[in-house]
Design a protein with these regions (language model features):
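N-terminal glycine-rich anion-binding loops that anchor highly charged ligand groups
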Residues: 6-38, 58
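Mobile, glycine- and charge-enriched loop segments
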Residues: 1-5
Length: 101
């Protein structure tokens, strides 16, 4: 295995990819924007910018319920906007891994 120098967000994106990520939906904002920008470079991962944090969370939760490993990225304050689908997922559960950053 070869070594590669990565910045933190590039390393997160690489880890998600190597962990089997299939869907990434994010709302842009520092410091998490670079994660999705890096994920978008992988052809076999569907990635999108959502219109808001709630939609990004809904896409990630829905993908995970359908069995695809997913990622949802946003600023920390955006979690307030995404709270409804996050709380719903906590009691409905998911069927595949889901990362929120």
């Amino acid at each position: 295995m070869s070594k590669k120098l990565l910045i933190g967000n590039e390393a997160v994106a690489r880890g998600l990819y190597e962990g089997g990520l299939r869907v990434a939906s994010s709302y842009p904002g520092t410091p998490s924007t670079e994660i999705t920008e890096c994920i978008a470079k992988y052809d076999d991962v569907y990635s999108e910018w959502a219109p808001n944090e709630k939609v990004a969370m809904e896409v990630a939760v829905g993908s995970s319920i359908a069995g695809a490993r997913s990622f949802c990225g946003m600023k920390h304050v955006g979690l307030n906007v995404a709270a409804d689908p996050l709380f719903t997922a906590s009691y409905t559960g998911v069927n595949a891994g889901m990362v929120i950053a």
